[in-house]
């Protein structure tokens, strides 16, 4: 089976030229879902324009010049997604969304690049009656702290992933929208509306819009704020 994707069929969340080549880059299975991730090959060649050819991009990676979340990565099909921090040639970038829901790069300072936000996506009981938590970027954490909830967002340091702040999904706290018609907007939660049955819970914002709970990514509280208003976005 050919592990390739036609460029015209690549997810619209990936901003690459559609007609330059026949085949498009296919991410390896990894931390982020295939349709919500971009390969490092695309980041180097199509986003940052640091190479013209795949071979040149592969050489940059092979030389250990690229880090993701503080760790060196050499695989050209390595998948990066929302909130990942990429360091290359002394510059740092964070993967965010634009107004069309496509993944883009936001330039970061070195200080801010040392931090990442993780959203808790799942919570299950692990062996030994411990708690296993899964985050939006595919990481797994084992803890005895039962107070941590799905929907919480953690501010962690990279690369050691130590939690410095926990932002709860609750009225008064600030959030970033990751999908839907309000993608790439920020707002302050006014109310969380629980729906009956299989309907998705709604989150209402002081700014006058609403979205489903799954699209809400917390970024601020009364004690902590993480600004996502990129002035320089690539491409």
Curated annotation (Swiss-Prot):
SMART domains per record:
S4
Which Gene Ontology terms describe the biological processes this protein takes part in? Answer: translation
Cysteine pairs forming cystine bridges in this chain are none
Q: Which CDD domains match?
A: KOW_RPS4, S4
- Could you tell me which residue ranges the S4 RNA-binding domain spans? 38-99
PROSITE patterns on file: S4
Sorted alphabetically, the keyword list is: Ribonucleoprotein, Ribosomal protein, RNA-binding, rRNA-binding
Q: Does the keyword Cell cycle apply?
A: no
**Entry's SUPFAM superfamilies?**
Alpha-L RNA-binding motif
- Keyword Ribonucleoprotein assigned to the entry: answer is yes
Its cellular-component GO annotations read: cytosolic small ribosomal subunit
Pfam families attached to this UniProt entry: Ribosomal_S4e (PF00900)
Q: Which PANTHER family match?
A: 30S/40S RIBOSOMAL PROTEIN S4, SMALL RIBOSOMAL SUBUNIT PROTEIN ES4
Its family remark reads: Belongs to the eukaryotic ribosomal protein eS4 family.
Q: Which NCBIfam families match?
A: PRK04313.1 (NF003312)
Q: What is this protein identified as?
A: Small ribosomal subunit protein eS4
């Amino acid at each position: 089976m050919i592990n390739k994707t036609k460029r015209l069929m690549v997810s619209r969340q990936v901003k690459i030229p559609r007609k330059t080549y026949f085949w498009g880059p296919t991410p390896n299975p990894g931390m982020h879902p295939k349709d919500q991730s971009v390969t490092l090959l695309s980041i180097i060649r199509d986003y940052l324009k640091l190479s013209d050819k795949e071979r040149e991009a592969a050489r940059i990676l092979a030389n250990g010049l690229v880090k993701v979340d503080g760790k060196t990565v050499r695989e050209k099909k390595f998948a990066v997604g929302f909130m990942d921090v990429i360091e290359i040639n002394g510059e740092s970038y964070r993967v965010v969304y634009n107004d069309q829901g496509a993944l883009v790069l936001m330039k970061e300072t070195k200080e801010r690049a040392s931090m990442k936000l993780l959203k808790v996506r799942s919570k299950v009981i692990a062996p030994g009656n411990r708690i296993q938590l899964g985050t939006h970027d595919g990481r797994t954490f084992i803890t005895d702290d039962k107070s941590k909830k799905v929907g919480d967002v953690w501010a962690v340091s990279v690369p050691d992933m130590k939690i410095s702040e926990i932002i709860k999904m609750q009225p008064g706290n600030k959030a970033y929208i990751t999908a839907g018609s309000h993608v790439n907007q920020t707002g302050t939660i006014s109310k969380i509306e629980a729906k009956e049955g299989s309907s998705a819970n709604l989150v209402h914002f002081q700014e006058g819009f609403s979205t489903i709970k799954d699209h809400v990514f917390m970024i601020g509280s009364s004690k902590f704020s993480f600004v996502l208003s990129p002035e320089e976005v690539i491409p």
